[in-house]
């Protein structure tokens, strides 16, 4: 199954859960073609710092962008690393194979957030392909069962512009 779109993200726990779900479906054979875009909805210093670092890597080292994002997400959520600490940026850069010091790019975060808001993004994680955006939050049960079928359901809702809101209590 091919799954594509633009994912608006920050460094929140719900984005980490969604990222882990996507990693799991990728291991099951899904062809993921996702463009990860910064979205700063709240006054969250951790997300603001992390997003500014990732945007700098996107601009200056686009081929290492994904590896750097993955490293920062893991450092934040597996090691509770402080994304405002330059040592965290250095560790993520090393993990991503970057020798440069990463200078934050907060203006790019602002531009990406404004782009997302114009599309209707109000929180993260949100996917945009065409038409209305789809906010997707998964719980730990998302990693069990038929993951590709679950991804197919998400894809079907994303494609159906007649569905605007589906909610199921967590």
Regions found by a protein language model. Give the residues of each.
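C-terminal cap of thioredoxin/glutaredoxin-like
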Residues: 19-22, 82-170
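Structural alpha/beta surface segment adjacent to cysteine/selenocysteine redox centers
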Residues: 2-87, 164-165
């Amino acid at each position: 199954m091919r799954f594509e779109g633009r994912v608006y993200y920050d460094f929140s726990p719900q984005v980490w859960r969604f990222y882990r779900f996507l990693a799991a479906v990728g291991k099951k054979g899904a062809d993921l073609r996702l463009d990860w875009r910064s979205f700063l909805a709240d006054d969250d210093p951790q997300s603001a710092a992390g997003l500014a670092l990732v945007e700098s890597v996107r601009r200056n080292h686009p081929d290492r962008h994904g590896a750097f994002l993955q490293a920062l997400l893991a450092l934040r959520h597996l090691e509770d690393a402080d994304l405002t600490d330059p040592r965290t940026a250095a560790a993520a850069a090393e993990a991503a194979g970057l020798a440069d010091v990463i200078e934050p790019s907060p203006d790019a975060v602002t531009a990406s957030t404004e782009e997302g808001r114009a599309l209707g993004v109000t929180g993260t994680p949100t996917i945009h392909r065409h038409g209305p955006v789809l906010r997707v939050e998964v719980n730990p049960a998302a990693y069990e069962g038929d993951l590709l079928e679950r991804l197919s359901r998400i894809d079907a809702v994303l494609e159906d512009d007649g569905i605007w809101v589906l909610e199921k209590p967590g």
